[in-house]
A protein has these predicted regions:
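Acidic, surface-exposed loops and disordered segments
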Residues: 16-169
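N-terminal amphipathic/basic-hydrophobic helices that include classical n-h-c signal peptides
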Residues: 1-21
Length: 169
């Protein structure tokens, strides 16, 4: 393929712009961490909206967008949610807000992957805003009493059986 001088300029300008963005994104990836202890400060409504919008525009197989997000802010509910599995969920009790990630298993056979992508996108958006987050796995986990973590969360929020509960962010 032969490139004319104008095309070379356009391509090189695009590449320079893209490299700058990718360096910023790479830095975001390097700096992102899972946080299990949180500050007492309130979250800005605009930040929460941005995080949820990011998840809502995340890619999904065949654009099924079968995921849904349950935002939890009530302290008592967060405390109860922190008991959804035997180990690793207690940090939920100390956060200001949690997002339960669920997906309609009848819409896509790859609902786990779709919901996982949305979850990671939420984490990256939170990190970009300077906010900490942590993925709390729910699917295929159990409470201290041996109850399925999915069933525990499903019962807490009245989630229909057709929805799989993947995680809490």
């Amino acid at each position: 393929m032969l490139l004319l001088p104008r095309e070379i300029f356009v391509i090189s300008s695009y590449v320079k712009f893209r490299i700058k963005i990718m360096k910023d994104f790479h830095q975001l990836l390097l700096n992102r961490r899972s946080y299990r202890k949180y500050k007492e400060q309130e979250l800005k409504a605009e930040d929460v909206k941005l995080i949820l919008e990011a998840a809502l525009v995340s890619p999904s197989s065949k654009s099924t967008m079968g995921w849904e997000f349950i935002v939890v802010e009530d302290k008592e509910t967060l405390e109860k949610l922190s008991l959804c599995k035997e180990h690793g969920a207690r940090p939920i009790a100390g956060c200001k807000l949690a997002v339960v990630v669920v997906a309609d298993t009848t819409k896509s056979d790859v609902w786990v992957e779709d919901a996982s992508i949305a979850s990671v996108i939420m984490q990256l958006q939170a990190a970009d805003l300077g906010l900490g987050s942590c993925w709390i796995q729910v699917r295929q986990r159990f409470t201290a009493d041996g109850v399925s973590s999915e069933d525990y969360v499903r019962e807490m929020f009245g989630i229909p059986e057709q929805f799989g509960v993947l995680s809490v962010m």
